[in-house]
Amino acid sequence: MIQKNWQELIKPNKVDFTSSGRTKATLVAEPLERGFGLTLGNALRRVLLSSLRGAAVTAVQIDGVLHEFSSIPGVREDVTDIVLNIKEIAIKMDGDDSKRMVVRKQGPGVVTAGDIQTVGDIEILNPNHVICTLDEGAEIRMEFTVNNGKGYVPAERNRSEDAPIGLIPVDSLYSPVKKVSYKVENTREGQVLDYDKLTMSIETDGSVTGEDAIAFAARILQDQLSVFVNFDEPQKEAEEEAVTELAFNPALLKKVDELELSVRSANCLKNDNIVYIGDLIQKTEAEMLRTPNFGRKSLNEIKEVLASMGLHLGMEVPSWPPENIEDLAKRYEDQY
């Protein structure tokens, strides 16, 4: 059936986010099919850096300045350096309409992003960011134009034909994501060792959390890829939808290598061809102790783990093992 092309691919059963403040986060997703770590990591990284919307300054007007190659008396930085500093102001703004914000300050002192007077729906996220430095007696007034957008827009595209004299266009860095890196490692799922583990590190400007940024990027990819799906989702047959009534505890379908056992105990079970918990609990203590390299310490460890699950050695399971044990294990894996 065609749905097996995607339904039988393994999906991550572990997706963990670790945040460090509002600007940094790390995502760990595992297991993934071999090669999917690189595929998803690269796709998410590209979308995170290029396609998420944010706010940025698009133009600035400085009193007494006609163009960006000017200098201002009493201001240590020239206008070109001031414009470069303005590009780095991190802004969060609601709505799509263009907004204005103003800063006016007298020297001596440092003009920072926190000195900017904003309207209610604009928030400065890096108020300590330095814009320029004023000497004694110097004064500066700047008016900024702020817009929402995505990606990077060069200053030339922000220059309008009807712009007043002295309005200096600014390169706009709209993306709220500043850095993204990822790595792919091998990970284990059951007895298979060659699945992928994807780790992504993301740094934002604070207007969006790392976790939300990844969620938005994934949604963009989902929407873009949906246009290539040229068929309706096949309906599952009734017998596939019906859940088999088990005659035993679903926990018996869990594989013993998923238990938190010592290496010695796990190897002994593997060498004795004990794959599922259902295989294990039917063994008696005497049978276990006859297993090569299996001692009293390993026995006590296994008894303790089974007891935590309400199980013990020497149990009888008349219908064990079921004929379709692998299918049942997949079907009931979310119940143990």
From Swiss-Prot:
Keywords: DNA-directed RNA polymerase, Nucleotidyltransferase, Transcription, Transferase. Signal peptide: none annotated. Residues 1-232 are annotated as: Alpha N-terminal domain (alpha-NTD). Its EC number is 2.7.7.6. Gene3D superfamilies: 5' to 3' exonuclease, C-terminal subdomain, DNA-directed RNA polymerase, insert domain, RNA polymerase, RBP11-like subunit. It is an enzyme of class 2 (transferase). SUPFAM superfamilies: C-terminal domain of RNA polymerase alpha subunit, Insert subdomain of RNA polymerase alpha subunit, RBP11-like subunits of RNA polymerase. InterPro entries: DNA-dir_RNA_pol_insert, DNA-dir_RNA_pol_RpoA/D/Rpb3, DNA-dir_RpoA, RBP11-like, RNAP_asu_C, RNApol_insert_sf. It catalyses: RNA(n) + a ribonucleoside 5'-triphosphate = RNA(n+1) + diphosphate. The keyword Transferase applies. Residues 248-336 are annotated as: Alpha C-terminal domain (alpha-CTD). The N-terminal domain is essential for RNAP assembly and basal transcription, whereas the C-terminal domain is involved in interaction with transcriptional regulators and with upstream promoter elements. NCBIfam families: PRK05182.1-2, PRK05182.2-5, rpoA. Belongs to the RNA polymerase alpha chain family. DNA-dependent RNA polymerase catalyzes the transcription of DNA into RNA using the four ribonucleoside triphosphates as substrates. This is DNA-directed RNA polymerase subunit alpha.
